[in-house]
From Swiss-Prot:
Source species of the chain: Rhizobium meliloti (strain 1021)
Record-linked SUPFAM superfamilies: LeuD/IlvD-like
Protein name, UniProt field: 3-isopropylmalate dehydratase small subunit
Keywords: Amino-acid biosynthesis, Branched-chain amino acid biosynthesis, Leucine biosynthesis, Lyase
Domain of life, per lineage: Bacteria
Length: 201
């Protein structure tokens, strides 16, 4: 998993509440267990017309936001079914950070496990960030996980809180396997001690 220390990039505004995982990645894309390639299905029902052509009115199809790294979204983002394909699709598109006033718990935790930083802010701060994100190609935000701070295009900053353990994992690029490997020495010592004390086992 890639480390997340500081991210600077275009932020796309998506001022819609209750965006569920089916909206993020429709069920037609759930047949694969590969994490790559799902970016094409991200927000597919809103992003494409019925004939498969891009919907020019959808934010991620607009030239200024086609390479967005940050998503500023409405309340209760990621609700619905607990499909891990949702963060996979966001990540494959190139989005490493989602900012909202609240997230569904399972989606929130899945983001951390897949290298995405979900940030909870107040409605007042979200309104400011949504305004910043509406500037098109000038909608540049910097998200500093070490400082726990978001800096807008005008230099104004917003502080945010994140669980210390989850922060440690993202800063060091540790998924569940990485966490286990980080404790490799302790595991080896335990196995050796157990083998010495229980030679019959």
């Amino acid at each position: 998993m890639d480390k997340f220390v500081k991210l600077t990039g275009v932020a796309a505004p998506l001022p819609v509440v209750n965006i569920d995982t089916d909206m993020i990645i429709p069920k037609d894309y759930l047949k694969t267990i590969k994490r790559t390639g799902l970016g094409t299905g991200l927000f597919a029902e809103a992003r494409y017309n019925e004939d498969g052509t891009p919907n020019p009115d959808f934010v991620l199809n607009k030239p200024a936001y086609q390479n967005a790294k940050i998503l500023v979204a409405g309340d209760n983002f990621g609700c619905g079914s607990s499909r891990e394909h949702a963060p996979w699709a966001l990540l494959d598109f190139g989005i490493r950070c989602v900012i909202s006033t609240s997230f569904a718990d399972i989606f929130y935790n899945n983001c951390f496990k897949n290298g995405i930083l979900p940030i909870v802010v107040s409605q007042e701060d979200l309104d400011k960030l949504m305004d910043d994100a509406s500037r098109g190609s000038n909608a540049i935000l910097t998200v500093d996980l070490e400082a726990q701070e978001i800096t807008g295009p005008d230099g104004g900053s917003i502080k945010f809180e994140v669980d210390a353990f989850k922060r440690h994992c993202l800063l060091n690029g540790l998924d569940d396997i990485g966490l286990t490997l980080e404790k490799g020495g302790s595991i080896d010592n335990y196995e050796k001690a157990t083998a010495a004390s229980r030679p019959w086992a």
